[in-house]
C-alpha cells in the first residue's frame, strides 16, 4: 500500500512540475511576443524618422537582424539616436516630433524591462532543467 501511494504521489509531483514548466514557457513566449511587438513598433518608427540606408538595407531590416542576434547593442544604439534627435527637436522647438520622441523613449524603457524579465525567466527555467 505504501509503495502504491508513494508512486501516485511521485506521479502527481511530476505532473505538477511539468505543468509549472509549461506555464513558465507560455509566459516566456508571451513576454517575448510583447517584446517583439515593442521592438517592431520602435524599428518602424526609427525607420520613418531616420531614413538612412545601411548596406542596401533599410534601417528596419538592418536593426531587426542586429536585434535578433544581440539585443543590448540595439537598445544602446537606438537610445543614442533618439537622444540626438531629441536634442535637435528641443533646439528647433519642434514640439510634434519631440512628443513622438518622448513616446519612443518610453517604448524603449518598456522594451528594456520586458527583455530583462524574459532573460531572468530563461535563466530560472534553465536552472530547473
Residue spans of the language-model regions?
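N-terminal secretory signal peptides that target proteins for export/translocation
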Residues: 1-2
Amino acid at each position: 500500500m505504501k509503495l502504491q501511494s508513494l508512486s501516485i504521489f511521485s506521479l502527481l509531483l511530476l505532473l505538477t512540475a511539468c505543468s509549472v514548466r509549461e506555464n513558465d514557457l507560455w509566459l516566456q513566449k508571451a513576454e517575448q511576443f510583447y517584446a517583439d511587438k515593442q521592438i517592431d513598433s520602435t524599428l518602424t518608427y526609427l525607420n520613418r524618422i531616420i531614413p538612412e540606408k545601411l548596406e542596401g538595407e533599410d534601417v528596419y531590416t538592418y536593426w531587426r537582424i542586429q536585434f535578433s542576434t544581440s539585443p543590448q547593442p540595439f537598445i544602446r544604439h537606438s537610445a543614442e539616436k533618439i537622444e540626438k534627435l531629441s536634442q535637435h527637436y528641443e533646439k528647433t522647438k519642434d514640439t510634434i516630433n519631440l512628443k513622438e520622441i518622448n513616446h519612443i523613449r518610453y517604448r524603449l524603457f518598456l522594451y528594456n524591462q520586458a527583455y530583462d524579465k524574459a532573460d531572468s525567466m530563461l535563466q530560472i527555467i534553465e536552472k530547473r532543467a
